[in-house]
């Protein structure tokens, strides 16, 4: 399946795809999905965890509060989105890590990003990503 020029392709890396699936069915956003303006693919990093417990987080190296996301499942998740890009014949998309510590996502930035063919978004709820 080739991607339509109008369709905005999103790969969303999230531990809770069910939470995001609901918003694709209602309101203005839901109409966009129904009219094929947007296509979203949910990628759960747990699918790339290597242990029996599907662990994707760990304590921060050197201590400190909170947990960090393990790099390996996150890298594999983004690589699976890159494979999707190639199969759809679209150019390499920007990867944006949405995190509480990051800058606020403002309207001007959203307008700028809307000119892209799509995005790979990482919806994080952790203190950060393991940098080891």
Regions from the PLM with identified roles:
Residues 70-125, 129-130:
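S-adenosyl-L-methionine/SAH cofactor-binding core of RNA-modifying enzymes
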Residues 23-27, 108, 132:
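Generic recognition of short, well-ordered alpha-helical segments
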Residues 46, 129-132:
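Acidic-glycine-rich active-site phosphate/pyrophosphate-binding loop
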Residues 2-81, 85:
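N-terminal nucleotide/polyanion-binding subdomain common to many enzyme families
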């Amino acid at each position: 399946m080739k991607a339509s020029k109008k369709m905005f392709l999103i790969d969303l890396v999230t531990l809770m795809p069910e939470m995001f699936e609901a918003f694709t069915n209602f309101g203005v956003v839901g109409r966009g999905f129904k009219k094929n303006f947007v296509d979203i693919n949910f990628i759960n990093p747990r699918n790339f965890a290597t242990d029996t417990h599907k662990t994707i987080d760990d304590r921060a190296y050197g201590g400190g509060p909170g947990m960090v996301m393990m790099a390996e499942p996150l890298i594999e998740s983004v690589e699976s989105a890159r494979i999707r890009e190639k199969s759809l014949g679209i150019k390499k998309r920007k990867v944006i890590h949405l995190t509480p510590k990051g800058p606020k996502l403002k309207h001007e930035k959203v307008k700028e990003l809307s000119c892209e063919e799509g995005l790979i978004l990482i919806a994080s709820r952790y203190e950060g990503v393991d940098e080891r």
